[in-house]
């Protein structure tokens, strides 16, 4: 930058001239004799005074000039810049030095040094580097300015004017600073107005004119460069000063409009307009001002009348904009002024100040009507709010292709000088809303015509009252794109014709422009960040051979250029204007908006803002689809915004992660209603980027830890060995030679395959013996590190970012439309299982036989052991995720795999946790089991650890101190077991007791003292097979004798299978019941106990009958060599009465004998079958009692549901045991002989025993109300058979029924042909009488115990006891 003190910025030095004069030596006397001139080069970055330049600075070219119009060096300060004595300046010979001008067409650098702020398929927004240091250092200072086609920018404050080439490629450009002669008195005063004046014939550089709005003072410099040079050399005034006469006290100037070469137009706050010239007719500097007459007002109107008649119908100060267009002849310009209410006025101005009104029109009503018709939303705004904000002239002389592409009217083709073709920026406002439109207007002497209306739909913010600059409209060549510049936004609007369609044709007929490309560039809401000046660049400007100005920007596309304090120059450039005229014009897409927000909004120093101003003009579905597409492109580096060959891969990956974070942040800020699928897909992409970054860092760690000769890590191997169909192939011809970096740049979306390939590398190296044992050990360690760490990182990222992505991390997404979780794909889960099992083998191998190779790193092996529980946890989690996701799928293959995974999970969640015990990972196994609520494994591990410690404590080889330590630790683990029971409840406690019972026995279960919730009691009560332990627990732990009795009785009555056990259990239960009920005063309780005791006694009676039968049969088979022989002998000896053809009865008898000899508890019906089918011999009466009587007792005490049918069966078998036809043959027999025949029958013996039992048990009366004929027909039909045979096949059941019918036929023969019913009555009476006789003789009752013997103890009818 040119400065009175030499600036030392690096970039500036690159643009300085190399033609420097040799620095004189200190002894050079010429320096001492030359007078010292005061240099006014003050650096903009300095404050207050300019220090004396040092010798080191003397040969640097000046970068900034400060020009003083006052010839007298007054000792005053303006805007902090002091004026020192002339002695402080450097040697005069440096003052004329300037940077060398490049030749025509020469570029100062290959690039313009700009920084892209955003870009899309239509335009690019960039920040140019050139900005005066002082403006950059004081962004809060009040300023405004303008951009000129000459390549210069102008900025004005209250005290200074700054001119610099804004297209310069250095940050500190050559800057000309002009101290204004008459600065504003108050900070609130309007800022000075300024403009560059086209170069004169004697100079290539423009001049500068500055007008003070309030005072009307004008200062003009003919050339900015010569003014600076002369001012420094001569120290005298080089600017021309004057004042505008005729201004009112309350009037100030609002606009300074260039109408060169004719001069300038001044717009006053009162509404007046004046012409100002800065050169006289001979081209010499000179300032003159003339007020313009109102159109059609006549020459008689003076300047005062002009104030009344100008813009007739409008209020004072109502002029919104004034612009000058080329006139029909050289030196002529047409100036048009537009009032905010829609009144247009036109003058033709000649060089020298001559002017004439040419047209006037009030188009307000027509504008309102046209806009309302084109944009229905404006009808909701009050018509009083309508105003014209600015206008721009439509370029003439356009190429036919641009004319055809434009939707403007045929006026584009007219070349009449009398027609002024314009585009008006108009708007409605209401509160915080506004609607803007671009309206084509043609102004002619006879009036105005309204053409196409182009609504602005993307920007609805009203104009800020405090904005330093009013909205500006630019329509640069070829008039296909309009730029609407607001204080904090720029609208880029296409003016091309939309594609042909019926709708577009109707809209065209109505002068309505259908929607075409439109986008908004927003600036941040910062007090210092607003547009304070603007301009445009257009193709063709400055391309003539005579134009040698180095700073004029040559462009092929229309551009808007903006000036923002603190930021500098911002250029909004159309990328390719030809696309707008093509069949595929650019359009705003959801993806392009997302790209801008993501890739440029992430920069903290970007003055643009991409969110929060307005909703996205797309549906949620469009935005979601675009977001997913963009996310994939970021992950795969398929977007041009991400370099494909980054210098730092880690930095590149972190940037991509930041882009993904910016994407979801933007979507949330815009309140996009994302569906669940979109949220999960975006989250999965972000997870993959985060994990891939972590893996790359591990890769670099692996490389650093490996020796120089062995740099092939598991990660580099995986990148090479992954199937070519599962990765992007290298293009070696294009220089792609690094497969690892290439994968991390292009294939991260396949991260699940990469992670799964870790096991494949191990498997390949192991099976192919590509690595020795130390090398394979390192690969195993790397594989475990990558698999475990990658999945941990992914799930932690998911947990941390769940709220941001709007998902529940604890819920696996399900549904056919939702993607498969990448952390639980088939490749991941399958290879995790294999890797885990390989680690088991690898650790077991080296635990059994440690490696003797000195290169084998045991620390890596220990790390694998330490990470094995975590790796197992990741395997379980992946399995669980996949099962949950696949369960909702309708794909048959997925469903099959889901079922397979469910089975694998159920198996592995136990086996692989318990497996950890083998590697002394007890605590880790406990935590893993707790995490997955694997209660079986948890119980196994916890109990196993307790038993291991107890065994170690009891080991005689263990030292006493170690034994005590183990015993104490075992107690601690028992306490933890108790806490786990409380934490996980009954299910876990039950499993723990099962493990404890199986491993340590009953004593360990009953002695466990840390069950505070009584889970053992619930467990034992719920386990009928453990009733023998349960009743002990009831007594010892619960103190519940009644409960013990209930347990014992329940076991003995319904579940016990061994006779002896049943007898003991019933007896103990009875004892406990008596003990519990003995202390009760409750009569109801006593009654209940009494009823239970009766049931016990009945069960015991049945048991005693079985025991008697067992003892009788055992005596006959005690010589058998084995159990099979016992059964065979018993069947042979006691089953002789069963006909061989009746196989069913024989099978029942044989099965019953086998069970009887095994001491099994027989069901009552089986026991009755044995008693009634056996041939026990005559001696059994005395030994055990009558068999049929015992069968009747069983039927009586067993309380059978079908007791009557059973009794009929018993009596039928009893009656058919004897041949009643012989008893009925009484011929030649006396009474005594006949009675003796009756007394030898089984019926008599059974009846005698029944009457004898009845004397002690009145309820026992199985012989009353029954006669032989009543026993017919029992169990003779299949449906009558008892429940024992319900599951038998029909063949067996048929045979059994046939056997029953055979019995029935035999009995029927006795009834019908042997008078059995009559003999039954006589036999019954005889048995009853003989029981009485026996009682009178004082004989012991046959049933005095509980079982009678069926005989009469010598009181038989054999003659020793006579009948009376």
From Swiss-Prot:
UniProt signal peptide: none
Domain of life: Eukaryota
GO biological process: poly(A)+ mRNA export from nucleus; protein import into nucleus; transcription-dependent tethering of RNA polymerase II gene DNA at nuclear periphery
SUPFAM superfamilies: Nucleoporin domain
Residue numbers spanned by region Disordered: 1-114, 531-554
InterPro entries listed in its UniProt record: Nucleoporin_Nup133/Nup155_C, Nucleoporin_Nup133/Nup155_N, Nup133-like, WD40/YVTN_repeat-like_dom_sf
UniProt biased composition (Low complexity): 49-62
Topological relation to the membrane, as annotated: Peripheral membrane protein
Gene Ontology molecular-function annotations: structural constituent of nuclear pore
Basic and acidic residues bias (residue ranges): 1-11, 65-81, 90-110
Task of the protein: Functions as a component of the nuclear pore complex (NPC). NPC components, collectively referred to as nucleoporins (NUPs), can play the role of both NPC structural components and of docking or interaction partners for transiently associated nuclear transport factors. NUP133 is involved in nuclear poly(A)+ RNA, tRNA and pre-ribosome export, in GSP1 nuclear import, in NPC assembly and distribution, as well as in nuclear envelope organization.
Family affiliation: Belongs to the nucleoporin Nup133 family.
Listed PANTHER family: NUCLEAR PORE COMPLEX PROTEIN NUP133
Annotated protein name in UniProt: Nucleoporin NUP133
Source organism per UniProt: Chaetomium thermophilum (strain DSM 1495 / CBS 144.50 / IMI 039719) (Thermochaetoides thermophila)
């Amino acid at each position: 930058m040119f400065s009175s003190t030499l600036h030392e910025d690096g970039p500036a030095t690159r643009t300085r001239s190399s033609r420097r004069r040799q620095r004189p030596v200190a002894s050079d006397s010429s320096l001492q004799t030359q007078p010292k001139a005061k240099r006014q080069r003050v650096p903009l970055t300095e404050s207050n005074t300019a220090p004396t330049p040092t010798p080191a600075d003397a040969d640097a070219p000046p970068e900034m000039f400060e020009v003083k119009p006052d010839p007298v060096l007054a000792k005053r300060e303006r805007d902090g810049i002091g004026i020192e004595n002339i002695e402080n300046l450097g040697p005069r010979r440096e003052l004329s030095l300037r940077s060398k001008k490049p030749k025509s067409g020469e570029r100062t650098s290959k690039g313009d040094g700009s920084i892209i702020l955003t870009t899309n398929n239509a335009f690019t927004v960039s920040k140019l580097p050139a900005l005066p240091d002082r403006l950059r250092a004081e962004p809060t200072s009040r300023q405004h300015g303008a951009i000129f086609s000459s390549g210069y920018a102008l900025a004005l404050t209250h005290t200074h004017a700054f001119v610099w080439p804004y297209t310069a490629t250095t940050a500190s450009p050559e800057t000309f600073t002009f101290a204004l002669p008459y600065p504003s008195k108050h900070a609130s005063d309007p800022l000075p107005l300024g403009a560059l004046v086209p170069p004169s014939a004697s100079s290539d550089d423009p001049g500068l004119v500055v007008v003070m709005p309030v005072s009307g003072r004008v200062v003009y410099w003919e050339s900015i460069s010569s003014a600076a040079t002369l001012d420094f050399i001569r120290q005298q005034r080089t600017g021309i000063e004057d004042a505008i006469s005729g201004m009112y006290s309350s009037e100030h100037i609002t606009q300074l409009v260039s109408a060169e070469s004719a001069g300038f137009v001044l717009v006053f706050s009162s509404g007046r307009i004046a012409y100002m010239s800065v050169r006289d007719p001979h081209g010499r500097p000179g300032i003159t001002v003339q007020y313009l007459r109102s159109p059609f007002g006549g020459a008689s109107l003076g300047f005062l009348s002009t104030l009344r008649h100008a813009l007739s119908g409008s209020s004072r100060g109502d002029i919104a904009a004034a612009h000058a267009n080329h006139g029909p002849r050289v030196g002529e310009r047409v100036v048009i002024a537009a009032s905010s209410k829609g009144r247009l006025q036109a003058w033709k101005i000649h060089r020298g100040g001559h002017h004439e009104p040419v047209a006037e029109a009030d188009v307000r009503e027509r504008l309102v009507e046209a806009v309302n018709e084109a944009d229905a939303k404006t009808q909701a705004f009050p018509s009083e709010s309508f105003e014209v904000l600015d206008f721009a002239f439509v370029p003439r002389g356009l190429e036919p292709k641009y004319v055809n592409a434009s939707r403007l009217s045929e006026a584009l083709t007219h070349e009449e000088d009398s027609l002024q073709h314009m585009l008006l920026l108009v708007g409605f406002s209401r509160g915080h809303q506004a609607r803007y439109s671009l309206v084509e207007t043609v102004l002619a002497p006879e009036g105005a015509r309204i053409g196409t209306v182009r609504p602005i739909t993307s920007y609805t913010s009203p104009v800020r009252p405090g904005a330093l600059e009013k909205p500006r409209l630019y329509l640069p060549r070829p008039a296909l794109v309009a730029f609407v510049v607001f204080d904090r936004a720029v609208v880029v609007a296409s003016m091309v014709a939309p594609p042909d369609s019926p709708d577009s044709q109707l809209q065209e007929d109505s002068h309505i422009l259908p929607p075409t490309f439109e986008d908004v560039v927003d600036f941040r809401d910062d007090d210092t960040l607003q547009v304070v000046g603007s301009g445009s660049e257009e193709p063709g400007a400055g391309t003539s051979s005579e134009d040698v100005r180095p700073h004029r920007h040559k462009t092929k596309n229309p551009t808007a250029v903006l000036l923002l304090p603190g930021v500098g120059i911002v250029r909004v450039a159309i990328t390719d204007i030809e696309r707008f005229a093509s069949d595929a014009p650019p359009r705003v897409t959801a993806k392009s908006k997302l790209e801008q927000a993501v890739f440029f909004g992430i920069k903290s120093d970007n003055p643009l803002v991409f969110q929060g101003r307005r909703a996205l003009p797309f549906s949620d579905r469009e935005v979601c689809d675009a977001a997913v597409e963009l996310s994939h492109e970021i992950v795969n580096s398929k977007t041009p915004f991400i370099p494909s060959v980054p210098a730092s891969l880690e930095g590149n990956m972190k940037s991509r992660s930041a882009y993904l974070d910016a994407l979801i942040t933007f979507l949330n800020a815009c309140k996009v209603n994302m569906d669940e699928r979109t949220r999960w897909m975006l989250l999965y992409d972000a997870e993959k980027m985060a994990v891939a970054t972590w893996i790359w860092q591990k890769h670099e760690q692996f490389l650093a830890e490996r020796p120089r000769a062995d740099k092939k890590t598991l990660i580099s191997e995986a990148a090479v060995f992954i199937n070519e169909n599962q990765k992007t192939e290298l293009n070696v011809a294009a220089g792609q030679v690094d497969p690892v970096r290439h994968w991390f740049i292009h294939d991260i979306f396949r991260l699940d395959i990469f992670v799964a390939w870790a096991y494949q590398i191990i498997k390949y190296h192991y099976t192919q013996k590509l690595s020795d044992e130390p090398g394979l050990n390192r690969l195993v360690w790397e594989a475990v590190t990558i698999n475990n760490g990658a999945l941990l990182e992914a799930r932690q990222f998911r947990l941390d970012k769940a709220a941001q992505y709007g998902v529940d991390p604890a819920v696996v997404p399900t549904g056919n439309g939702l993607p498969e979780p990448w952390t639980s794909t088939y490749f991941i889960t399958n290879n995790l299982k294999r890797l885990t099992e390989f680690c088991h083998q690898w650790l077991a191998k080296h635990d059994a036989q440690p490696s003797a190779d000195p290169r084998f790193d045991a620390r890596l092996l220990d790390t694998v052991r330490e990470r094995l529980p975590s790796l197992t946890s990741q395997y379980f989690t992946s399995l669980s995720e996949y099962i949950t996701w696949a369960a909702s799928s309708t794909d048959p293959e997925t469903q099959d795999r889901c079922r397979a995974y469910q089975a694998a999970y159920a198996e592995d969640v136990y086996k692989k946790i318990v497996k950890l015990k083998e590697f002394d990972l007890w605590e880790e196994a406990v935590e893993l089991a707790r995490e997955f609520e694997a209660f079986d494994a948890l119980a196994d591990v916890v109990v196993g650890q307790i038993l291991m410690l107890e065994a170690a404590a009891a080991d005689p080889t263990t030292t006493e101190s170690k034994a005590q330590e183990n015993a104490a630790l075992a107690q601690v683990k028992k306490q933890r077991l108790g806490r786990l029971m409380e934490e996980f409840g009954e299910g876990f406690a039950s499993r723990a007791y099962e493990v404890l019972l199986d491993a340590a026995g009953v004593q360990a279960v009953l002695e466990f003292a840390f069950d505070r919730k009584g889970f053992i009691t619930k467990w034992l009560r719920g386990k009928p097979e453990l009733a023998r332990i349960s009743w002990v627990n009831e007594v010892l732990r619960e103190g519940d004798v009644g409960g013990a009795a209930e347990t014992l009785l329940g076991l003995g009555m319904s579940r016990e299978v061994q006779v002896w056990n049943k007898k003991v259990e019933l007896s103990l239960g009875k004892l406990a019941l008596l003990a519990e009920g003995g202390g009760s005063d409750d009569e109801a309780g006593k009654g209940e106990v009494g009823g239970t005791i009766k049931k016990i006694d009945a069960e015991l009676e049945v048991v005693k009958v079985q025991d008697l039968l067992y003892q009788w049969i055992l005596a006959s088979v005690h010589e058998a060599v084995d159990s099979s022989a016992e059964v065979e002998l018993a069947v042979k000896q006691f089953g002789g009465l069963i006909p061989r053809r009746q196989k069913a009865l024989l099978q029942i008898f044989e099965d019953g004998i086998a069970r009887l000899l095994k001491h099994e508890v027989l069901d009552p019906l089986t026991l009755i079958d044995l008693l009634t089918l056996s041939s026990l011999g005559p001696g059994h009466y005395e030994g055990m009692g009558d068999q049929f009587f015992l069968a009747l007792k069983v039927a009586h005490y067993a309380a059978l549901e079908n007791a009557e049918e059973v009794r009929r069966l018993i009596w039928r078998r009893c009656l058919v045991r004897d041949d009643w036809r012989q008893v009925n043959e009484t011929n030649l027999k006396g009474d005594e002989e006949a009675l003796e025949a009756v007394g030898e029958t089984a019926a008599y013996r059974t009846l005698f025993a029944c009457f004898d039992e009845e004397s002690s048990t009145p309820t026992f009366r199985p012989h009353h109300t029954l006669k032989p004929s009543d026993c017919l027909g029992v169990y003779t039909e299949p449906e009558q058979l008892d429940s024992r045979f319900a599951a038998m096949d029909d063949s067996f059941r048929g045979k059994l029924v046939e056997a029953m019918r055979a019995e029935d036929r035999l009995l029927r023969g006795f009834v019908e042909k042997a008078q059995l019913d009559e003999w039954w009555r006589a036999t019954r009476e005889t048995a009853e009488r003989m029981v009485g006789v026996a009682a009178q003789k004082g004989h012991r009752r046959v049933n005095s115990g509980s079982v009678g013997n069926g005989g009469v103890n010598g009181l038989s009818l054999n003659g020793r006891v006579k009948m009376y």
